Amino acid sequence: MLVHSYSSMERADGLSSSSPGGRLSQLNQAAYSSAPPLCHTPASDFQPPYFPPPYPQSSLSYSQSQDGGYPHLPEPYPSLNSLHQHQQAAWHSQRSRSEDAGLLSQPHRALSLDPRREYPGVPRLLTHGLGDGAAALGDGPLGMHAVHHGLDDIQGLEEASALGILDHSVIKKVPLPSKLNGSTISALSLSKEGLGLGGVSNPAEVFCSVPGRLSLLSSTSKYKVTVGEVQRRLAPPECLNASLLGGVLRRAKSKNGGRCLRERLEKIGLNLPAGRRKAANVTLLTALVEGEAVHLARDFGYVCETEFPARATAEYLCRQTEPDQLPTRRSMLLATKEICKEFVDLMSQDRSPLGASRPTPCLEPGVQSSLTHFSLLTHGFGTPALCAALSAFQSYLLEALKLLDKGENGGKNHHDKELKHRK
């Protein structure tokens, strides 16, 4: 082992200021004359510092050049000088390759990379786990390390490549639902008549029972509301919302009443969107369910048939007619009777759906659709009520014709009596 003091060292190449030994040799000799000697071990025992890739230890060439005046001494810090030289060479080679490559390719532009930035000290990462666009980046002059340095950004690039896009933007990958929800299915399967779904339950099934609004307390009756009726109330022309439908079904008002009603309707395959506006004007008939409306029409027909004063009205109007107009009036009554009979026959052929029944139409589609529209607004009350009213009118026509026939016969007999009296 050789022991030397730095006070006696002198670099032969004149670069004493660039090495630690040269700097020490320029200091005051008196102040450092008694400095302890430095011991140097052979170069094979020296452990250089570890540098991660792309600077493998095996590729570093440590300079073993000796000074001319001291051939037996190694370089004091050979690893630092060789590392500096390797960095300079790598930077110049990367710069030359970047300039020769010219502009970036289209995938680089899609990722908004800056061609003026060089990253010689960052390794290429994960070029094998991405799509074609990412592989093209790995082959480019900047490599995959030019995109971002964080693992989160690399994961974002993997998701973008899986989606087939290279735009590093705010667009996120949204998984497609495996199946559509109830509202989407209802939107796809809406029909013209209502909000019925393809998976709606049996229309004849009873949804709930509703107490009547028009009955007295002593004879309160309940009417069954079917699924088909609820479907018709949600469909055009009424398009009831949750508030009106809850009132029709006599449901108590609560904080979450609308949501509970929508959830129950979804169970039977019906959709009632929140914030929906009604389509038709609200009338007194809107509050009636179909069972009570039909009951009202039946009672109205019974009263018209039994209690309508057809004879009294016919006698009153016949007395208002001049005797010379009686034949003309009789012809008018007969024609009106035929017209009324035609209309009643047409109304009797109405096959609008009502309650749990859905009869087969026997009229033309245009006429039947119009009658169905009227029936949906009156909930089964309109057509039977019209037929009952027309039946009462027909009773009046029959009584008027009887009076005219009786009057003519009475006048003819009176004329014969006068002729006999003159003779």
From Swiss-Prot:
Q: Which InterPro entries match?
A: TF_AP2, TF_AP2_C
Compartment annotation: Nucleus
Annotated keywords: Activator, DNA-binding, Nucleus, Transcription, Transcription regulation
Major site of localization recorded for this protein: nucleus
At the top level, the lineage of the source is: Eukaryota
Q: What is an annotated GO biological process for this record, any one?
A: developmental pigmentation
Q: Where is the composition biased (Low complexity)?
A: 14-27, 57-70
Entry GO terms, CC:
nucleus
Region (H-S-H (helix-span-helix), dimerization) location: 276-405
What molecular functions are annotated in GO for this chain?
DNA-binding transcription activator activity, RNA polymerase II-specific; RNA polymerase II transcription regulatory region sequence-specific DNA binding
Q: Where is this region: Disordered?
A: 1-108
- List where Polar residues composition bias occurs: 79-93
Q: Where is this motif: PPxY motif?
A: 50-55
According to its UniProt record, which protein family does this protein belong to? Answer: Belongs to the AP-2 family.
| Oligomer and partners | Binds DNA as a dimer. Can form homodimers or heterodimers with other AP-2 family members.
The function of this protein is:
Sequence-specific DNA-binding protein that interacts with inducible viral and cellular enhancer elements to regulate transcription of selected genes. AP-2 factors bind to the consensus sequence 5'-GCCNNNGGC-3' and activate genes involved in a large spectrum of important biological functions.
Recorded protein name is Transcription factor AP-2-epsilon
